[in-house]
């Protein structure tokens, strides 16, 4: 149990995919201007990653390995992720048109979000058992969503602040991201 808790803390805080691995930077910079968009994207990414991880893990060990088709893992995972994103997009469009509109082009970009594929590949390459795979696949997108939410709240406050003209927009956002990365590096000693 302690090992699973350490894996959860590591995947959420210590090895955060945005701040330490620099994965998922496109939605991080693009969707973080409003809290509502960041929350919607965070929930969508959590859902897609958890389901994609479960499906790809099962496909890999129940289909690809027995048929000795392990070399097909990448293309199989990409197809699974693309299908899940399409289903998620259709669901959000039907249930929350405002969220769908606010996410814009970033929702279909979850298909190419390297965080999703990274989680699926790390589960296989690290030979995680089912419990480890589940914890890592929940922790990583939760860390993504946490950082996205914190960053969006800071960016909303920055919109109300006086920022020098040279730093308005993305420059100040990148400075804030660097400070956040430094702050999150303090969690390294926990595990």
Label each region the model flagged.
Residues 23-37, 85-99, 151-162:
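C-terminal ends of transmembrane helices
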Residues 3-19, 68-83, 134-147:
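Structural signature of hydrophobic alpha-helical transmembrane segments
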């Amino acid at each position: 149990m302690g090992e699973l808790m350490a894996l959860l803390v590591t995947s959420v805080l210590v090895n955060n995919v945005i701040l330490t691995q620099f994965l998922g930077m496109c939605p991080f910079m693009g969707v973080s201007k409003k809290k509502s968009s960041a929350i919607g994207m965070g929930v969508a990414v959590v859902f897609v990653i958890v389901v994609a991880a479960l499906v790809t893990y099962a496909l890999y060990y129940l289909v690809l390995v027995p048929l000795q088709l392990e070399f097909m893992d990448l293309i199989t995972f990409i197809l699974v992720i693309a299908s899940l994103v399409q289903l998620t997009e259709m669901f959000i469009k039907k249930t929350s048109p405002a969220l769908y509109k606010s996410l814009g082009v970033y929702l279909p970009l979850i298909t190419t979000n390297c965080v999703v594929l990274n989680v699926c590949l790390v589960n296989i390459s690290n030979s995680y058992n089912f419990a480890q795979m589940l914890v890592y696949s929940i922790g990583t997108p939760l860390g993504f969503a946490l950082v996205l939410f914190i960053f969006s709240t800071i960016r909303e406050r920055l919109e109300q602040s006086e920022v020098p003209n040279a730093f308005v927009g993305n420059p100040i956002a990148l400075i804030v991201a660097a400070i956040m990365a430094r702050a999150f590096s303090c969690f390294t000693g926990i595990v």
